């Protein structure tokens, strides 16, 4: 399986994402810069955290118009796994690949610590490696992770089981304690916590690795079935 890590000006978690795939998952991975226009040959797309374009205007608002984004949207429409973490989640929201928006954290402070999450839906291509209702600990690092949507959208997210991860503690004021959601099809996931920073027991936590092993397992199963 071949992964693309999209690199925007100001991305600072691209190397972590690359390491998680190459060394944690043992799969092929390449950096793809924002100036590129094609993702041909890649099986999954990863949008890492950071401060793309300095987070000017809004987080992800400028990156959304990068030359690579039409290819990201095309990959999502083709059913390929697309994962946006932290700033990557914000870019997916700005691009309309996921519903809702991000606001400043409710206390107006940057939060950088390991938090407790609950796996709300383990039937997605990103979460099948977890148990339903499992509690996990994953690092966060953001100033604008306060997820917002209208009540109708929130009800729809719940009804369609699009909420994959939920905070199990106060973190940023996110509506419904949402930490990660998918699109209706289930192949695009945006999450504020950083699973790529929790893939090695050597560093004290490997509970994020299952996000990536889930993607790989789903891809292998679908390709074996297809063949």
From Swiss-Prot:
Its main location: cytoplasm. It is found in: Cytoplasm. Pathway: Purine metabolism; IMP biosynthesis via de novo pathway; 5-amino-1-(5-phospho-D-ribosyl)imidazole from N(2)-formyl-N(1)-(5-phospho-D-ribosyl)glycinamide: step 1/2. Its EC number is 6.3.5.3, 3.5.1.2. It catalyses: N(2)-formyl-N(1)-(5-phospho-beta-D-ribosyl)glycinamide + L-glutamine + ATP + H2O = 2-formamido-N(1)-(5-O-phospho-beta-D-ribosyl)acetamidine + L-glutamate + ADP + phosphate + H(+); L-glutamine + H2O = L-glutamate + NH4(+). SUPFAM superfamilies: Class I glutamine amidotransferase-like. GO terms for molecular function: ATP binding; glutaminase activity; phosphoribosylformylglycinamidine synthase activity. It comes from the Bacteria. Keywords: ATP-binding, Cytoplasm, Glutamine amidotransferase, Hydrolase, Ligase, Nucleotide-binding, Purine biosynthesis. The active site is at 86 (nucleophile), 194, 196. The keyword Amino-acid biosynthesis does not apply. One of its GO terms (biological process) is 'de novo' IMP biosynthetic process. Part of the FGAM synthase complex composed of 1 PurL, 1 PurQ and 2 PurS subunits. This is Phosphoribosylformylglycinamidine synthase subunit PurQ. It comes from Shouchella clausii (strain KSM-K16).
